[in-house]
Regions:
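Bacterial N-terminal signal peptides that target proteins for export
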Residues: 1-8
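Bacterial Sec-dependent signal peptides at the C-terminal "C-region" and cleavage site
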Residues: 13-25
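Active-site mouth of glycoside hydrolases
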Residues: 26, 31-244
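Short, ordered beta-strand-loop transition motifs
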Residues: 30-34, 384-388, 431-434
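Aromatic- and carboxylate-lined catalytic core of secreted/periplasmic carbohydrate-active enzymes
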Residues: 44, 261, 270-272, 285-429, ...
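A short, sequence-level motif marking secondary-structure junctions
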Residues: 50-54, 408-409, 432-434
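Extracellular glycoside hydrolase catalytic/binding regions
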Residues: 160, 167, 171-174, 180-333
Length: 468
């Protein structure tokens, strides 16, 4: 198991209203040549390990934002998702320094003092190696629905605001995330989003990727898959712990044509009321957030976003709680699920990255298919590389299952157990490549998940999760 090294806290001076390019600039991101993954501008694979911090710009001081970002950098998160025009009265409730984001509810009149604070947070995140997944606005500002609103966007001012943002953050390490938890319900909604995207492109010259954050149990592909500005699909598979009817949709987006990368930008949060019904179902725990990590990755996602129910809203006891957070954000950042996300990243990065594909046929269907590959919370999923040098099977529960050994090309197969709870790998043995073989996880508890890793022995890959 590798040991975490906390990154040094870099003090970043804000020398102008517009962030300036410096030696610490993060490389821009682009879509890989096979259209399945993200890579840096020099072609290195990029693992999206995101955290939802929707109210970061709106509610946090620089000191608290810095502490939060340092925590996430130490846990090897690579993206933080935050909103410029925030959800919770973001147009009328000022930020921690008393500044509103725009004047007169007019997106063409941004408040420089508010955005100087955004500048500072973006620069601090970038200095720590974290990209900001920047939402120009939460969705209630263009489709009020259940939010506070008001609806302030038109196609015309959305384009102007987008271009202004694009110019301001042209050199920053960001990804643009349009939308904000709202559906497209008419042509005007689509025109607003499209205009904002085109404005961003004009402003930053195409420097940054663009996606769309949809409402629950939906994906950007529903409305925008064929649009040129949409670089990759983002899903919100939602706050359910069930694979069936939720996380199975990641592979449906993976299979769409034309090919575009896909990521789950909002799965079930840790400590969240399960399916929004705490009285009946309680709150989610670490195992509930680990499962979607592997379900999504092994279904073809290029990364994954985590969230904690207290952290996204940066709840403290002096604030009105939204949907029953369990603890203040300062405590919630230490919840176990957050630390366990990095083990999924380490596992994927320890094997060839850009050739990975989902392959459920690695798993032998049990006599009772609802047992293996299973349904609900207990779905087994598998992935491998196109050269058949390795395969991985995620077992969400300690249940015996069988695999096709010839999913691997080598004559001899080295097998490992990888523990998603602590990132350790244990060698099982070396086996001939023939027939089907049953494996039983080391522990058989309900919340004790495991990953079986099968390697072509001749490749001499390091232990799963180890850095090359």
């Amino acid at each position: 198991m590798f040991r975490l090294i906390s990154p040094a806290l870099v003090v970043v001076a804000l020398v102008a209203a517009v962030p300036q390019e410096s030696a610490s600039r993060l490389p821009h991101l682009k879509v890989s040549d096979n259209h399945r993954f993200l890579v840096t501008e020099d072609g290195r694979p990029f693992f999206w390990l995101g955290d939802t911090a929707w109210e970061l710009f709106h509610r946090q001081t620089r000191e608290d934002a810095g502490r939060y970002l340092a925590n996430r950098a130490a846990l090897r998160f690579t993206v933080v998702q935050a909103v410029a025009l925030a959800e919770f009265d973001g147009l009328t409730a000022p930020n921690a320094y008393g500044h509103l984001p725009i004047r007169n509810n007019d997106p063409t009149q941004p408040n420089q003092e508010y955005f100087a604070h955004v500048d500072w947070i973006v620069a601090r995140a970038n200095a720590l190696g974290i990209y900001i997944g920047l939402l120009p606005t939460w969705g209630d500002k263009w489709n009020k629905k259940w939010g506070a609103g008001p609806e302030i966007f038109t196609p015309e001012n959305a384009a102007t605001y987008g271009e202004w943002l694009g110019r301001r953050y042209k050199d920053a390490g960001i990804v643009w995330i349009l939308g904000g938890d709202r559906p497209i319900e008419n042509d005007r909604h689509k025109e607003i989003i499209r205009a904002m995207a085109h404005g961003l492109r004009r402003g930053d010259g195409g420097a940054h990727l663009i996606t769309f954050h949809p409402p629950g149990n939906n994906g950007s592909s529903t409305w925008f898959h064929d649009e040129d500005w949409l670089d990759f699909n983002m899903r919100q598979n939602g706050h359910s712990p069930e694979f069936t009817g939720h996380y199975d949709r990641t592979q449906a987006d993976y299979a769409r044509s034309p090919i575009k990368p896909v990521v789950d930008g909002e799965p079930i949060y840790e400590d969240h009321p399960v399916s929004f019904d705490a009285k009946k179902l309680g709150h989610s725990i670490a195992s509930d957030v680990r499962r979607p990590l592997y379900w999504d990755l092994f279904s073809g996602a290029f990364g994954h976003t985590y969230g904690n129910h207290a952290v996204w809203q940066f709840w403290t006891p002096d604030r009105a709680p939204i949907n029953n957070p369990l603890m203040p954000w300062q405590q919630a950042v230490e919840e176990p699920g957050a630390a366990q996300m990095q083990y999924g990243r380490a596992l994927i990065e320890s094997r060839p990255f850009l050739t990975r594909v989902p392959d459920p046929t690695v798993i032998v269907t049990d006599r009772v298919p609802t047992s293996v590959p299973g349904e609900g919370r207990y779905r087994f999923v598998a992935t491998r590389d196109t050269d058949a040098t390795y395969a991985m099977v995620y077992a969400p529960v300690g249940r015996t299952f069988s695999v096709r050994m010839n999913a691997i090309a080598g004559a001899r197969i080295k097998a490992w157990w990888f523990n998603p709870r602590n990132g350790t790998a244990t060698a099982i043995g070396v086996f001939p490549n023939s027939g089907e073989r049953a494996f039983t996880p080391p522990d058989r508890g309900e919340t004790l998940d495991w990953v079986l890793v099968l390697d072509d022995e001749s490749k001499r890959y390091p232990p799963p999760g180890a850095r090359w």
